[in-house]
């Protein structure tokens, strides 16, 4: 990767970084930043079965899979992965380097920080603020704001004593 610009000059080529989620998206973020620093334009992909309403904004190197519904006035940052069958409601902002798995329901007017993970079938009620580097576990229902680096698991929405800094190294 260090010499990629010699073989594929940024003035002639664009890229998509196809790395899956791991370690709170740290590797994907590292390659995103290095690729941008080399001068590359990064493409995003949205599956054709995803329904996107008007007034949608999306950053670079995003990957949105099949059968999502993305309502009006949604903003998605750079380097975001969104699995299948999600509902992202109106006026929602998703920060850079987040991973939304599948079957997630997000109410309207949600603000999500950077480097967050949302597990399978999680639900986030409307008008919720989620800080940076948070983990929302599978099946969790979020009914109140989530501070930076907090971890919520199970459908009881109990905050765990561990910080996402520690858990991020194992998932």
Regions inferred by a protein language model and the residue ranges of each:
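Phosphate-bearing ligand-interacting subdomains
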Residues: 1-47
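Surface-exposed beta-strand edges and their flanking turn/coil or helix-capping segments
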Residues: 10-13, 30, 57, 133, ...
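Short amphipathic alpha-helical segments
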Residues: 28-31, 76, 147-148, 164-165
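Short, hinge-like loop/turn segments at secondary-structure boundaries
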Residues: 34, 61-63, 168-170
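Structural signal for interior beta-strand "rungs" in well-ordered beta-sheet cores
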Residues: 44-160
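Short C-terminal tail/terminal secondary-structure segment
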Residues: 143, 160-171
């Amino acid at each position: 990767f260090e010499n990629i610009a010699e073989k594929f000059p940024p003035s002639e080529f664009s890229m998509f970084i196809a790395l899956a989620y791991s370690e709170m998206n740290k590797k994907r973020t590292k390659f995103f930043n290095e690729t941008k620093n080399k001068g590359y334009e990064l493409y995003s992909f949205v599956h054709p079965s995803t329904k996107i309403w008007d007034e949608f904004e999306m950053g670079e190197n995003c990957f949105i899979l099949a059968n999502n519904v993305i309502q009006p006035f949604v903003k998605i940052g750079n380097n975001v992965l969104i699995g299948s069958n999600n509902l992202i409601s109106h006026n929602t902002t998703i920060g850079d380097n987040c991973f939304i798995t599948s079957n997630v329901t997000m109410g309207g007017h949600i603000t999500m920080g950077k480097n967050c993970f949302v597990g399978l079938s999680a639900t986030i009620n409307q008008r919720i603020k989620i800080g940076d580097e948070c983990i929302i576990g599978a099946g969790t229902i979020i009914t109140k704001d989530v501070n930076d680096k907090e971890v919520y698991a199970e459908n009881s929405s109990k905050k765990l004593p561990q910080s996402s800094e520690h858990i991020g190294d194992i998932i």
